[in-house]
């Protein structure tokens, strides 16, 4: 969800010229649309691309972008033949119609339940809102060491600015893209579960899962790096088949 520039660690600019972008902290629908615009600009300026590789928020963002693009333009081909998704977090919506369907019609009492940030209150929300908010709060709790923000930072807002999760039970769009799903066996349970939910968005038979012994990370050991490389080569080869 990169929309702001970031000062990079010393020495990186000698390898990559920049600019260096950082993730958007707000996670709201407007920020999602800003991120989609950056993807569109990149596709237009530097594309076409055969595939995309994403980690954590990057993986979730590319899934969000493709889902909402597919929903808006179902007859258009997608810009990637394959995806490599490593430890994705929750995919978030930018589409106003989807967000309104999930959160926009809530009563003031239900809006207060969201703002309370309490599981006991969120569990009393109408079904669609409860599914989306539970998925979101599980990931927010699991990633606080990264975001350095409590639930209230994201939930105590006007409803149009509350992050809205794309859940496979609520977003029925599916992606016919060859996909490698990579996850660490010691990742937080909520993040591990999120990987399975994201996997549900894909209906291509060209799918492979690679699990490694790290947590919210990519493989680091030599054998696992080689195994992941083999899995990447396999999914790329599959994407080139009819």
From Swiss-Prot:
GO molecular function: hydrolase activity
Function: Serine hydrolase; part of the gene cluster that mediates the biosynthesis of communesins, a prominent class of indole alkaloids with great potential as pharmaceuticals. Communesins are biosynthesized by the coupling of tryptamine and aurantioclavine, two building blocks derived from L-tryptophan. The L-tryptophan decarboxylase cnsB converts L-tryptophan to tryptamine, whereas the tryptophan dimethylallyltransferase cnsF converts L-tryptophan to 4-dimethylallyl tryptophan which is further transformed to aurantioclavine by the aurantioclavine synthase cnsA, probably aided by the catalase cnsD.
Active site annotation, chain numbering: 56, 138, 216
Gene3D superfamilies: alpha/beta hydrolase
Assigned keywords, A-Z: Hydrolase
Family of the protein in this entry: Belongs to the AB hydrolase 3 family.
A cellular component term, taken from the record's GO annotations: cytoplasm
Enzyme class label: hydrolase
Pathway: Alkaloid biosynthesis
Enzyme nomenclature, EC number: 3.1.-.-
Protein name, per record: Serine hydrolase cnsH
GO biological process assignments: antibiotic biosynthetic process; monocarboxylic acid biosynthetic process; secondary metabolic process
Entry annotated with the keyword Hydrolase: yes
Pfam families registered for this protein in UniProt: FSH1 (PF03959)
């Amino acid at each position: 969800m990169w929309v702001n520039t970031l000062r990079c660690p010393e020495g990186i600019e000698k390898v990559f010229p920049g600019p260096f972008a950082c993730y958007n902290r707000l996670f709201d629908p407007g920020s999602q649309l800003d991120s989609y615009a950056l993807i569109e600009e990149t596709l237009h300026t530097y594309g076409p691309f055969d595939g995309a590789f994403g980690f954590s928020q990057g993986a979730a963002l590319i899934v969000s972008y493709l889902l909402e693009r597919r929903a808006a333009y179902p007859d258009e081909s997608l810009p990637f033949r394959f995806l490599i998704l490593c430890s994705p977090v929750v995919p978030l919506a930018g589409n106003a119609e989807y967000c309104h369907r999930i959160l926009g019609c809530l009563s003031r009492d239900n809006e207060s339940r969201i703002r309370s940030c309490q599981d006991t209150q969120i569990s009393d929300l109408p079904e669609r809102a409860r599914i989306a908010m539970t998925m979101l709060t599980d990931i927010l709790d699991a990633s606080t060491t990264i975001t350095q923000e409590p639930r209230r930072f994201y939930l105590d807002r006007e409803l149009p600015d509350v992050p809205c999760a794309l859940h496979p039970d609520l977003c029925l769009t599916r992606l016919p893209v060859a996909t490698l799903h990579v996850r660490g066996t010691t990742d937080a349970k909520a993040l591990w579960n999120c990987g399975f939910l994201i996997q549900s968005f894909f209906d291509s038979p060209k799918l492979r899962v690679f699990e490694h012994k790290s947590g919210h990370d990519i493989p680091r050991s030599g054998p696992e790096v080689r195994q992941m490389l083999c899995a990447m080569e396999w999914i790329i080869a599959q994407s080139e088949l009819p």
